[in-house]
Amino acid sequence: MRSCLGFLVLMVVAGSAVAQSENPGDIPPGHEVDVQLSNDTLQLKYLSSGKKVGVENSRFSGAFFLSEDRDIVLSAGLVFPVDFDFGRLSVLIGPQVYAALLNEENNDVMAMSLGAELRFVLDKDLDLAVAGYAYYAPDVLTFGSADNLTDLSAQVEIPLSKQMKGFAGMRWFEFDLTEGGGTKKLQDEIFVGLGYRF
């Protein structure tokens, strides 16, 4: 019950903190497709303005994740810019939903998380930046064969051309399984990737 109330409070705070400007920071005007690779994982991610799903002043994302063990995770999120001036730092918060088909039979998971995404521009001329996110789904909002979900990532980004960027970083992505099943680590390693804006 406490977890549920805490999550609802966070959602209210998130809703009251979003920016009201017409052109908030870090909301892409067009579309972006990212391809992320590590030794054991592949992820394809699509980013666009939330207008595509009928929500103004937001950013929508959808992703397909595949591990070497043939774990498949689909996710979708909607984040909103925080209404504070942090200079070179942009902060977005919002929910993200995960649907996982794990390689073990009958080990499927659905989770509704809340998190934050940050991006800090190190060099404005080069648009060199560090970025990261943190999402957590508590037991009360995690269904199926897991009790909770944790998804953390940090990366360095650098533009390669007007429409393309390169990035590299580290991701920690795991479920705590039910009935003493331990921890299911989907990713715990370095990755590299490319992003294309159009």
PLM region descriptions:
Residues 70-76, 80-83, 91:
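Intrinsically disordered, glycine/charged-rich N-terminal periplasmic/extracytoplasmic linker segments
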Residues 14-16:
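N-terminal signal peptide c-region/cleavage motif recognized by signal peptidases
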